[in-house]
């Protein structure tokens, strides 16, 4: 298992132990389970309907749209929300500080931040959060 997978699995186990996910979340009578599914990593599976096909055990190829919009007809024909990791990474900060604070970062036409992966023959490979509209590749 890759380091990132280990960290995600550990974080999910900690969330279950703390009562943030699972049955009767924090005594609210609301329950949700999260299942981690490690894909093969094919680029095309980044397209939401291809990801759903892969999760269903099929070849990870995009479905024809319409009528297959995941919010109405997704995993096993059920309504499905598909988010990328960058969207999910922004949620804790947004929920803590609010949309106005988030949109105050960056530029007027490109507010907020984004994640970028730097790899190859570079001095500091990794995943970085940058402010939209202000950082260049040279930086």
Where are these regions (language model features)?
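Short amphipathic, charge-patterned alpha-helical segments
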Residues: 133-139
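Glycine-rich phosphate/pyrophosphate-binding loops
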Residues: 1
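Hydrophobic alpha-helical positions that pack around
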Residues: 5-132
């Amino acid at each position: 298992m890759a380091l990132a997978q280990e960290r995600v699995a550990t974080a999910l186990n900690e969330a279950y132990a703390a009562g943030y996910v699972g049955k009767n979340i924090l005594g609210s009578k609301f329950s949700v389970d999260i299942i981690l599914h490690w894909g093969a990593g094919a680029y095309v599976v980044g397209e939401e309907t291809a990801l759903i096909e892969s999760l269903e055990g099929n070849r990870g190829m995009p479905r024809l749209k319409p009528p297959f919009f995941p919010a109405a007809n997704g995993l096993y024909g059920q309504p499905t929300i598909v988010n990328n990791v960058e969207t999910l990474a922004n949620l804790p900060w947004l929920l803590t500080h609010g949309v106005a604070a988030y949109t105050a970062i960056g530029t007027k036409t490109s507010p907020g931040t984004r994640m970028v992966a730097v790899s190859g023959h570079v001095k500091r490979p990794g995943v970085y959060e940058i402010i939209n509209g202000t950082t260049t590749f040279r930086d």
